[in-house]
Every structure is written in structure tokens, then in C-alpha cells.
Amino acid sequence: MLLQRCVHESARLHPSSPVARRRAECPLTLATDEAVERGELVTIDLLGANRDEKIFGPDAAQFNPYRQTDKGSSPYGLSFGLGMHACIGRTLAAGVTPKPDSNPLDHQYGTITLIASALLEHGARPDPAKPPKMDEKTERPNWGYYPVILDTPQS
């Protein structure tokens, strides 16, 4: 289950979008005492929220797959949204958060963990003849090109 914990921690630190936007359905006051009127657009800083030391501890900005979160906090933070705005594919992608008594043989790891596991089992490694390249058309750090070599399966 360590690989799944690595996937969750990576998703927390590197959400697919750094922000989320929601429109207020009623007047409210934020924790910062800022008033928000009905219909106003509110921007949620996912990068900041996912690094909140009150929730993720003093090393919140660091990669730590052994991180423990309080009940009610997900190990991947707000990266998949929350409530009615939660990503419909969250469980398919990230799987079910393991519990102490989870059976590794029938645990639902999620497709990201299963794909990463298959790549590791096949010896996936960077292709030294074709170095990876970042996508320069976006401000976010995304790979545009990352060729790998796989070992030939033994029959």
C-alpha cells in the first residue's frame, strides 16, 4: 500500500489545477473575516490548502508518504475536490484510502497506483537516448514528453 500512499501524497502536492473556483450561493464570511456576497466568485487556493500545516503537519510542503492525517481529512487534500464538487473519478483514479485493517490482496488501489505498479514491475526507466522535456506551453510544471524503456517480459 506504500505505492498508493505515494500516489496520494503526489496528488496532494501537485493537484491537476492549482485553484478551484466556486460561486457563492448565499452571503457568507470566510475564516479571514472577508465577506462574500451571493453570486460572487470565490477562488480556492488548492496548492496552499494542500500544504496547510494545521492539517498536514509542520512538513506539509514536503513529500512524505507516511504522513498521517486526521479523520475527516483525505491524504490527497482537496486535489479531487470535496462534497458535491468532488471528482466523479476520484475512487477510480486514486482508489480507496487504506485503513489499518485493509487486506492488500483485495484492496481497491485505483488505476494510477495499478499503472505505476505495472510500470515498476516491467522495469520502467527513463530512456537515456531520449531525455524528457517539459511542456513549455503551460505555466504549470508538466512533462510534454517523457520516454521510458520497459524490460521485455519473461515467458
Set out the residue ranges of the language-model regions.
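Short conserved micro-motifs at the rims of enzyme active sites and ligand-binding pockets
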Residues: R22, E53-G57, S74-Y76, G89-A93
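Hydrophobic alpha-helical segments
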Residues: L13, S17, Y66-T69, C87, ...
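Short, glycine-/Ser/Thr-/acidic-enriched flexible segments
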Residues: G48-N50, H85, A93
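C-terminal helix/juxtamembrane-tail motif
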Residues: T138-S155
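Cytochrome P450 heme-binding "Cys pocket" and the immediately downstream C-terminal segment
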Residues: R90-W143
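Hydrophobic, well-ordered secondary-structure elements that form the walls
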Residues: S10, G39, F63, G83, ...
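Conserved cytochrome P450 K-helix/beta-meander segment immediately N-terminal to the heme-binding cysteine loop
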Residues: R38, I44-G72, F80
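Conserved cytochrome P450 K-helix E-x-x-R motif and the immediately C-terminal K′/meander segment
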Residues: M1-E34
